[in-house]
Swiss-Prot record:
Organism annotation: Danio rerio (Zebrafish)
Pfam families the UniProt entry points to: DUF3314
Protein family: Belongs to the UPF0575 family.
Protein name: UPF0575 protein C19orf67 homolog
Coiled-coil annotated residue ranges, if any: none
InterPro entries recorded: DUF3314
């Protein structure tokens, strides 16, 4: 009896210590992120930014360079801290898999992803935010910050997939508790607020049916409405996706191409499957988003929509930062020149 009580007390103390340690770790991460948010705010004030165009005739002073390098260094230290925490969680999982229930691993991933969100937003907003009253960020600084974002994104994706392989989290989008995707930052470009999300693995574009289309990223784009009071007011969000689709190239088509090039076609009997990457927009078809009939909305359990391709990116999967660059470039082109249209 005494041994049973002792074991229960030891278990309770262990769980309490682990909970306190997790809370301490989260507070430490949060404090460091808040500190670096203050640092990052000075990137956009124009104080230590310079035009890298050699024709400008401006060369940054040694003091300017030193201050900028110090700011980058402090943000990089925060990145290394988050990466080390990811390594620590992975080590705990691998070495403790025989007694995993004692470590509360099911809560680690959601908590850690949420903790990393402010740091992602710090990187994305500092690198991409546009302000008409401040000079643009130097390309070198922008590249470093986006590399930090890409590095952390890739590491978190690996960590989520590892925990999912041990059944500590679900990647099924239909599961309310799943971690099929996570936030990798937010930025403000002109009148657009862009929230960026990364799917941990190719996920069916429609959860209700298989279309052969799989999503890898999502962007929620909200446009600011002018003349709506003192505070900023945004229109309803538009949803854009980075998707892939396996396209079968018929053997006859391949043979024709090769025949025209003078190549032999005797062994070309199998079809080739090519994975094509594209960026497109979710367009709702039912209920009609422009209808004022509320009955359609009340009776509809799940809105219907389709994927409208905007950009074709080819066979190679782009990084999350490159894909975001492509989308923002297209959206800004549409805003400026009105030349951007949906590919039918």
């Amino acid at each position: 009896m005494a041994n049973t009580e002792h074991d229960e007390l030891a278990s309770l103390l262990r769980e309490t210590n682990e909970a306190e340690q997790s809370l301490t770790d989260q507070e430490a991460i949060t404090e460091t992120v808040e500190e670096n948010t203050t640092i990052a705010s000075s990137f956009g004030d124009g104080t230590f930014l310079w035009d890298e165009d050699p024709l400008s005739g401006y060369t940054p002073s040694c003091e300017d360079t030193r201050i900028m390098e110090d700011k980058i260094s402090r943000i990089e230290k925060q990145l290394q801290y988050l990466l080390s925490k990811a390594d620590e969680f992975q080590t705990q999982l691998v070495w403790s898999r025989n007694c995993v229930q004692d470590y509360g691993f099911g809560n680690i991933i959601p908590m850690f992803l949420e903790t990393c969100q402010p740091f992602f937003s710090l990187l994305e907003s500092t690198a991409r935010n546009s302000n008409p009253f401040c000079p643009p960020q130097s390309s070198n600084i922008r590249m470093q910050l986006l590399q930090f974002s890409q590095q952390l994104c890739s590491r978190l994706e690996q960590l989520v997939l590892l925990f999912a392989s041990f059944s500590f989290c679900s990647l099924e989008e239909s599961d309310p508790l799943s971690v099929s995707h996570f936030s990798i930052g937010q930025c403000q470009i002109d009148n657009m607020k862009v929230s960026i999300f990364r799917y941990c693995c190719p996920t069916p574009f429609l959860a209700s049916s298989l279309t052969g289309l799989y999503k890898r990223m999502r962007w929620n784009v909200e446009r600011e409405i002018e003349g709506e009071g003192d505070g900023k007011t945004y229109d309803s969000a538009e949803f854009y996706f980075l998707c892939c689709e396996d396209v079968i190239e018929a053997a006859d088509d391949q043979n024709e191409d090769r025949s025209s090039e003078g190549e032999s076609t005797e062994t070309d009997s199998e079809s080739k499957v090519s994975r094509i990457w594209s960026i497109g927009r979710w367009v709702q078809t039912y209920p009609d988003p422009n209808t004022e009939d509320i009955i359609d909305w009340v009776l509809c359990s799940l809105p219907c929509g389709q994927y409208k391709q905007l950009l074709c990116l080819g066979n190679e999967e782009p990084s999350s930062c490159t894909a975001t660059d492509c989308l923002l470039g297209a959206l800004l082109s549409q805003e400026t020149h009105g030349t951007f249209s949906i590919i039918k």
